Amino acid sequence: MQKPTRPQPKAGVLDIAAYVPGKEHVEGVAKVYKLSSNETPLGPSPHAREAYRHAGEKLELYPDGQALALRQAIAETQGLNISNILCGNGSDELLGLLCQTYLAPGDETIITEHGFAVYKIQTLAAGATPVTVKEKNERIDVDAILAGVTARTKIVFIANPANPTGTYLPFEEVRRLHAGLPQHVLLVLDAAYAEYVRRNDYEAGLELVSSNENVVMMRTFSKIHGLPGLRIGWIYAPLHIIDAMNRIRGPFNMNSAAIAAGAAAIRDRAHVEKSVAYNEKWLAWLTEEFTRLGLRVTPSVTNFLLIHFPDDAAHSADKADEWLSRRGYILRRVGGYGFPNALRMTVGPEEANRGVVAALTEFLK
């Protein structure tokens, strides 16, 4: 066997396909509207901006390793026990910590066919095997998940609402899923878009976490709170899970600006409600306009839409993406999520929303 001539990553790392974010720029186009990352067009709360500026006056100090001010704000506004809250440098870090804590080679996780790519990446990084199950009509299929559970299953990941479809699983179905899982299997409910949902049969997961030992709810400040640049995520979980994750968490994983701005953002309920109202107005308008153009739109409860294009080559999603990009509108290609002929569009500023509709009207002539 030939000796390696340089350090080698552990087995399996080079088999992982790196996450590919949405594009940010279009060559030769000066003015672009980035509608590919589900960022809020209203931006963060003014109070969060002020807290961020104030945090800049103390950069010589280490942040609070427990992120106490942020956890306190989350606990107070959500009616939760602060001891059951763990904050991280974005939900991605927390997903990684969960997988490092609970997965080993030979273990399996279950993800759905259109699920968030990071679930698979972090599963593989931990040396475990992701098992993909089918969805039904662009919705999570509880029966398919339960049928996929084996003696090796350790974690089940579901995004609710789901990305990139924008669909959701009613709480009774989530409850049925949990009831069908063995007690040692961890159910992770990724509720990144929960604040946008205004449906009586939806619940983000607080109730299940509070009454069980094997459920984790994950949330983010990157969507409705408008702070993706600061990377703030949090989980609500049983104490034994929080304790285990804290044992391998970095001692200062949250920076001071993120702690301060996040605490201010989640306390500003008026800004959240303003963002919800804006989104509901334009989500409905965009859905109606795209449908009028003859495009199928997956019904969404989030701040984005999955737009399906005709089968003819001249009007495919790839052609539409090229057409829109040349006009300064960046949408998200979702072929990697199992939708080769669809684009995902964030609800953006009014001028961008109207501009995309006008551009697609011309494209489809």
Curated annotation (Swiss-Prot):
It comes from the Bacteria. Its cofactor is pyridoxal 5'-phosphate. Its EC number is 2.6.1.9. The keyword Flavoprotein does not apply. Transmembrane segments: none annotated. It catalyses: L-histidinol phosphate + 2-oxoglutarate = 3-(imidazol-4-yl)-2-oxopropyl phosphate + L-glutamate. GO terms for biological process: L-histidine biosynthetic process. It is an enzyme of class 2 (transferase). One of its GO terms (molecular function) is histidinol-phosphate transaminase activity. InterPro entries: Aminotransferase_I/II_large (IPR004839), HisP_aminotrans (IPR005861), HistidinolP_aminotransfase (IPR050106), PyrdxlP-dep_Trfase (IPR015424), PyrdxlP-dep_Trfase_major (IPR015421), PyrdxlP-dep_Trfase_small (IPR015422). Pathway: Amino-acid biosynthesis; L-histidine biosynthesis; L-histidine from 5-phospho-alpha-D-ribose 1-diphosphate: step 7/9. The modification N6-(pyridoxal phosphate)lysine is found at K223. Keywords: Amino-acid biosynthesis, Aminotransferase, Histidine biosynthesis, Pyridoxal phosphate, Transferase. Homodimer. Belongs to the class-II pyridoxal-phosphate-dependent aminotransferase family. Histidinol-phosphate aminotransferase subfamily. This is Histidinol-phosphate aminotransferase. It comes from Brucella melitensis biotype 1 (strain ATCC 23456 / CCUG 17765 / NCTC 10094 / 16M).
